[in-house]
Amino acid sequence: MTKGNRSALSSPLALLIRALALTAIVGVLATGPVTSTATAETPAQFIYRVSHSTFGDIGSYSNTVEPSRDGITVQTRAHFQVSMLGVRMYREDATRTERWQGNRLVSFQGVTDKGDGPVEVKGEARGNGFVITSSQGTITAPASVHPANPWSNNFLTSNTMMRPDSGKIEQVRIGSGLETTVKIDGTTIAAVKFEIDGSTKYTVWLDGRGVPVKFVADDDTGKVTFTLAKCIGCGPEPTQIGNR
């Protein structure tokens, strides 16, 4: 890529990268009229396709939830890629592991590669806090901190989120849940809509199982949308309203 092309694209791509942090929205949800899936008594996997209103399909995102006697382990895989005219302009690959005991995060380990080499973030519960170590140093977050990752709706009480790619902490404001409907692959289903005010404006829809079926970040680059493509072990299908 020429220096000129890189300069012309750097601004929207930088904003797009920030927009991809929209996974924060479920990690900081307030209580609402949805059915809790926080207990995670059986294994489950959530697979999302990711699209951008300008760049089109840009990748996939998945969470695999594995309960055990000692708590819950969440394995996350992410792959994002932006191409224009057949030329790759941006990519991001990430693998992350969270370990939970009840509603407390006890450890976190993530590796993110945005094309400049892997960047590692680690965290562990210590006393009344959660100690996060990254390339930017070591900080202590509140014990209630949650990673920006939508694996269930048990993240109902924390307004503090951790960016999994950098380890940065952010405070957010959460709106009340609104009962509504949302279209997923042409099918209209009942859902609860939340709006979250952080560094970017976010919207998330949870179905009656408490599963985040869709979430969107909207900024001046356009909309980045995560849509649930497959949900393994999630229980009965959500209520459908109308036909495809």
Locate predicted features.
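N-terminal secretory signal peptides that target proteins for export/translocation
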Residues: 1-14
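Solvent-exposed, non-transmembrane regions of integral membrane proteins
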Residues: 4, 32, 51-54
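Bacterial N-terminal signal peptides
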Residues: 16-32
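Boundary at the C-terminal end of the N-terminal hydrophobic targeting segment
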Residues: 36-40
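Solvent-exposed helix/loop surface patches that form functional interfaces
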Residues: 41-45, 109-191, 195-197, 216, ...
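N-terminal mature ectodomain segment of secretory-pathway/periplasmic proteins
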Residues: 42-126, 210, 217
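Gly/Pro-enriched, hydrophobic low-complexity segments
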Residues: 55, 71-79, 91, 97, ...
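Short, surface-exposed beta-strand/loop "edge" segments at domain boundaries and coil↔beta transitions
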Residues: 56, 80-87, 116-121, 137-143, ...
